[in-house]
Amino acid sequence: MKKTFLIITVILIGVFFASCSANRGFVSTVTRDDIQQLAQFEMYAHFGRVENGVSIIDNDSVTNTAKSLFETELAHDKTLPVTETIAISDNLVRNKVQDEIRWMRIYIDNNVPVKDITIPPTIDSILCSRNVRFGLLVHNGGFYCPDGIYKSPGSGIPIPFAHEGSTRSAIIIVDSKFKNLVYVATSNLKSNPLEAETYRKQIKDLLKEYRK
């Protein structure tokens, strides 16, 4: 069932007009050479679509397409040493992992010090049970605006967009040994979330510090 984005709508519009990119990199003593095995969790994705130039509505079709495009481009990139993909069949556990990824992105966006962000319990437990130290978490969200126009919820004044939407992505690598984050990168891009080129650009940006 479709639901209107509430506070999320305001956040997304604000992000759209913010800088196109933000990046960090390695945030612990771990280096690229230390990461020989990396387990990738299912990415968290959440997209909306502007309907009738008035509201951003949750849209499963946009979400699924954007998720598939990002995953395909990330797999083609080959920068990260992903050695396994973690598939979770238990819906309760899967939902917990998705929620933990979502909250980690919220902490990062709200400038919570990285040293104060610990690996979430469900993700940590899964990595430990597989005897894998490092886990890859991916977040992707935003909205699609097919008409290129959005009407402000308060005034109804049309706001023209130069692009057909916005994507907000993050790549986070966590360490189950020391229970912390080792790599954090975020990217906000004013671009169509239904085009593969959007994610080629975004992944290049997200991993530029990893490649150094």
Question: Could you tell me what each predicted segment is?
Answer:
Residues 1-4:
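Positively charged n-region of N-terminal signal peptides that target proteins for export
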Residues 6-11:
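Sec-dependent N-terminal signal peptides
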Residues 20-49, 125-134, 139-212:
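C-terminal/domain-edge helix-coil "capping" segments
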Residues 52-137, 184-186:
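N-terminal segment of the mature soluble domain
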